[in-house]
């Protein structure tokens, strides 16, 4: 997943995820809007986006979807995450960006 970055918004009882493409070490190109969970199926929304963009390597697609699953599962198991939990998230998922609202 070195070509992509997943960004997660943690909002009370909602988690949202979007996908950005790395252009350089410091520049990102947003590829998707934020997809929300649990109001909608963020995983399925991301899968639909990936399926409609054949330039995304299948290996990257699997890694992106697996990472979304891992983060959502961690978020659900942790009940509600607090701002101080971001450090643990960054350690557990160093390839993702987390923003607590």
From Swiss-Prot:
Gene Ontology MF terms: structural constituent of ribosome
UniProt-listed Pfam families: PSRP-3_Ycf65
Keywords noted in UniProt: Chloroplast, Plastid, Ribonucleoprotein, Ribosomal protein
A GO cellular-component term linked to this record: chloroplast
Localization annotation: Plastid, Chloroplast
Primary localization: plastid
InterPro entries per UniProt: PSRP-3/Ycf65_sf (IPR038447), Ribosomal_PSRP3/Ycf65 (IPR006924)
Biological process according to GO: translation
Stated role: Probably a ribosomal protein or a ribosome-associated protein.
PANTHER family referenced in this protein's UniProt entry, alphabetically: 30S RIBOSOMAL PROTEIN 3, CHLOROPLASTIC, OS04G0461100 PROTEIN
Subunit structure: Part of the 30S ribosomal subunit.
Protein family per UniProt: Belongs to the chloroplast-specific ribosomal protein cS23 family.
Protein name per UniProt: Small ribosomal subunit protein cS23
């Amino acid at each position: 997943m070195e070509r992509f970055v997943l960004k997660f918004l943690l909002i009370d009882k909602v988690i949202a995820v979007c996908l950005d493409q790395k252009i350089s070490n410091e520049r990102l190109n947003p590829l998707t809007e934020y997809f929300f969970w649990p109001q909608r199926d963020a995983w399925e929304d991301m899968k639909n986006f990936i399926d409609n963009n054949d330039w995304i390597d299948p290996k990257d697609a699997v890694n992106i979807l697996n990472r979304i699953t891992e983060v959502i599962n961690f978020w659900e198991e942790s009940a509600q995450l607090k701002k101080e939990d971001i450090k643990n998230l960054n350690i557990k998922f160093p390839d993702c960006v987390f923003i607590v609202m």
